[in-house]
A protein has these predicted regions:
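Alpha-solenoid helical repeat scaffolds
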Residues: 1-167
Length: 167
């Protein structure tokens, strides 16, 4: 039923169905994330915020939701709130790759290029960040570097420094 409504872009019915399921089964991460996704598709930022904020309240120790909330704030021009969340997460978990990347994106979006580069280095040169995560970030960095028409020297230098650390 959810798939049918979703394919037909009847998002109000998707939300109503998810709310009925939630009423019967109780609140869950999966349902809240699905409602969040649908609200974003509907461009209903108020309810999208509410869903993520409720997940943060429900699972206060799970920093993923805090970072997602920060990302939603960034996408909606609430940069100070986003920055505060990223700093809070990194103060509690300095090696949180998701928060490191989001903070780097914050610096880039706010025109703080030097801090962006430094934060990206912090993420990519952190031995506790999984190699797969580093590869994904590097892919994005390479694409962005090419789109911006920048010299590839920085990319090569960063690759060399990462490879020195990785077996």
């Amino acid at each position: 039923l959810l798939d049918i409504y979703n394919r037909q872009e009847q998002y109000d019915k998707v939300i109503a169905t998810l709310n009925r399921i939630e009423g019967k089964m109780g609140k869950s991460e999966q349902l809240s994330m699905e409602k969040f996704r649908i609200y974003l598709q509907m461009k209903d930022n108020k309810n999208a915020f509410h869903e993520i904020e409720s997940l943060v309240a429900e699972y206060p120790m799970d920093t993923r939701y805090q970072v997602v909330l920060g990302d939603v704030y960034m996408q909606n021009g609430k940069k100070d709130e986003a920055y505060g969340i990223y700093r809070k997460v990194l103060d509690a978990e300095p090696d949180n790759a998701m928060a490191m990347y989001s903070l780097a994106s914050y610096y880039e979006a706010t025109g703080q290029k030097e801090l962006y580069q430094r934060q990206l280095d912090t993420l990519l040169l952190n031995k506790k960040v999984p190699s797969e995560t580093k590869m994904n970030v590097m892919r994005q960095f390479v694409v962005q570097n090419e789109q911006d028409g920048r010299d590839s020297t920085r990319v090569i230098s960063l690759f060399d420094r990462i490879l020195e650390q990785e077996p």
